[in-house]
Amino acid sequence: MKKQRNLRSMAAQAVEQVVEQGQSLSNILPPLQQKVSDKDKALLQELCFGVLRTLSQLDWLINKLMARPMTGKQRTVHYLIMVGLYQLLYTRIPPHAALAETVEGAIAIKRPQLKGLINGVLRQFQRQQEELLAEFNASDARYLHPSWLLKRLQKAYPEQWQSIVEANNQRPPMWLRINRTHHSRDSWLALLDEAGMKGFPHADYPDAVRLETPAPVHALPGFEDGWVTVQDASAQGCMTWLAPQNGEHILDLCAAPGGKTTHILEVAPEAQVVAVDIDEQRLSRVYDNLKRLGMKATVKQGDGRYPSQWCGEQQFDRILLDAPCSATGVIRRHPDIKWLRRDRDIPELAQLQSEILDAIWPHLKTGGTLVYATCSVLPEENSLQIKAFLQRTADAELCETGTPEQPGKQNLPGAEEGDGFFYAKLIKK
């Protein structure tokens, strides 16, 4: 039996690592969840994701409730108070329980002398909640986004930025990809129904199913046997444009964690697939995905800017370049992105994408297809990136996705309930 731990203090420390140290919640949370009982895993996740989703509101409230911010070794208490405020605002946890557990968290982080302070701040919020929220809702902080990102969204989408922000602040739906080599989508939906769950097929993407209510993967029919994979609908859209065929040599570049690698092999089981990623640690997840689905691909560690180092002079019939990006289209799924990214990252990422595109293009056969994809909503990484590439690359032609003046297809978060995603299909003349 696992030792009873204070979830509020664990959540506070996790959020602090994201905000103060720039660590990804995807790396921090799984080891923490291993330390708590199964029934507490979901609450720990909710507290971490919820605080990061609403961080600017919680910060704003603390600044109103406290004369001075907590600094230095007491900084964790700042995040513990955030966890307390989040529970009072957004969960159905009874207020007395939320207060008691949060105050006890001070002991877990070795700050028992601050229990009274935490209790006082949270009770003060309860007393002033109505007035504070009215003031907050009249401020720019209500958008729950850093100002640099808000400015970029307003500039890129003058008519739509508010709906993008609203979608980013929602909890994401759970999308699945049905492995067509095992089941048709309809037959798997029947199995899901038998398991007491409900799913809805996507109108455009033939393998995509949205769960009515998110569920643990082990509850999904045939998950361990590779019948189904968790993957957002928009990410599945890559296959619509790539259209892989049996017998072809296909490169999945920037492939980790392998969701698109395995989707290629589901659509074209006899394709020769090479999956490449720069991050050796994340490549282990590509192997895991291939193993669970019973598939084979050539997996290599390599830098997309220097393809000759890992594929020599080899050319491919099709290339999927899921480029490194700001991930501003998947904020609802990874709210820590709002606080990990900086404005200066965008031109740096655009430069990296440009270098990878130029380096990999010679490795596409004449007549071949390259699909450039990102999970970003920012034009610098998407339409402007492809426009510049077309202008400097004489043998590249845009196909089916937009126009040379406005190249690519941009999904916005919430549209069709998928994440924000960009695709451009290029043919080599």
UniProtKB/Swiss-Prot annotation:
Q: What class of enzyme is it?
A: transferase
Q: Which reaction does it catalyse?
A: cytidine(967) in 16S rRNA + S-adenosyl-L-methionine = 5-methylcytidine(967) in 16S rRNA + S-adenosyl-L-homocysteine + H(+)
SUPFAM superfamilies given in the database record: NusB-like, S-adenosyl-L-methionine-dependent methyltransferases
Q: Which Gene Ontology BP terms does the record give?
A: regulation of DNA-templated transcription; rRNA base methylation
Catalytic site positions: C375 (nucleophile)
Q: Which residues bind S-adenosyl-L-methionine?
A: C254, A255, A256, P257, G258, G259, K260, D277, D303, D322
> One GO term of the cellular component aspect?
cytosol
Q: Which domain of life is it from?
A: Bacteria
What InterPro entries would the database entry show? MeTrfase_RsmB-F_NOP2_cat, MeTrfase_RsmB-F_NOP2_dom, NusB-like_sf, NusB_RsmB_TIM44, RCMT, rRNA_ssu_MeTfrase_B, rRNA_ssu_MeTfrase_B_ent, RsmB-like_ferredoxin
Q: What is the effect of changing C375A?
A: Loss of activity
| Secretion signal, residue range per the UniProt entry | none
What EC number(s) has UniProt assigned to this enzyme? 2.1.1.176
A GO molecular function term, named singly, is: rRNA (cytosine-C5-)-methyltransferase activity
* Keywords from the UniProt entry: Cytoplasm, Methyltransferase, RNA-binding, rRNA processing, S-adenosyl-L-methionine, Transferase
User: Where is it localised?
Assistant: Cytoplasm
Q: Is-annotated flag, keyword Nucleotide-binding? A: no
Its primary localisation, in coarse terms, equals cytoplasm
Similarity comment: family membership:
Belongs to the class I-like SAM-binding methyltransferase superfamily. RsmB/NOP family.
Q: Which PANTHER family match?
A: NOL1_NOP2_SUN FAMILY PROTEIN _ ANTITERMINATION NUSB DOMAIN-CONTAINING PROTEIN (PTHR22807:SF61), NOP2 YEAST -RELATED NOL1/NOP2/FMU SUN DOMAIN-CONTAINING (PTHR22807)
Protein purpose: Specifically methylates the cytosine at position 967 (m5C967) of 16S rRNA.
Q: NCBIfam families from the xrefs?
A: PRK10901.1, PRK14902.1, rsmB
Q: What is this protein called?
A: Ribosomal RNA small subunit methyltransferase B
